[in-house]
A protein has these predicted regions:
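A membrane-topology feature that recognizes alpha-helical transmembrane segments
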Residues: 1-171
């Protein structure tokens, strides 16, 4: 990752976290220009190798979280945000960021469930999610589907921000 990627990524993560906490949305007006700028800056700084590095990072973030998103486990704004971050930081650092994001998200969801008094529901839902996929064709149970208004939804941009920022310091 080139040092020029640090500040734009921090700014976009801060805005995405704010909008996700406020409205449970990560807007396209934020993510899509950030993605295009990441590709452009990588090409400008490193030529063709920068293009491939940027596309690899975008694929790493978009595909891995895209699978979770398509299965109903997270919103597509989170997926697009990870793809855009990958365009700036490349595939190797994006993999580190995704692992750290998963760890941060796991800790956050446990704290959220304890504070909300639904830790038992969380474990039951996780079991339904993990062990029931074959029966449902890789869709979440109805009580966990993101399009169900009764489903508890945790904003995930804070976890993405924490994981990405920690990946900067892991180098």
């Amino acid at each position: 990752m080139h040092s020029v990627a640090w500040w734009p990524t921090v700014v976009v993560l801060a805005i995405a976290t704010f909008t996700d906490l406020r409205s449970r949305r990560i807007p396209n007006w934020l993510v899509l220009p950030f993605l295009v700028a990441g590709i452009a800056v990588s090409c400008w700084l490193h030529g063709w190798s920068g293009l491939w590095e940027s596309l690899g990072g975008m694929a790493m973030g978009g595909v891995l979280f895209g699978i979770i998103g398509l299965m109903g486990g997270m919103g597509m704004g989170d997926v697009k945000l990870c793809a855009a971050i990958g365009a700036w930081i490349g595939p190797t650092q994006m993999l580190v960021a995704l692992v750290l994001t998963g760890m941060a998200g796991g800790i956050m969801v446990l704290c959220w469930a304890v504070a909300g008094g639904f830790l038992g529901d969380l474990f039951k839902g996780t079991g339904d999610l993990v062990f029931g996929f074959r029966k449902r064709g890789f869709r979440p149970p109805e009580n966990l589907a993101l399009n169900n208004p009764l489903t508890r939804k945790m904003p995930y941009a804070p976890a993405i921000a924490i994981g990405t920022l920690f990946s900067f310091f892991s180098r």
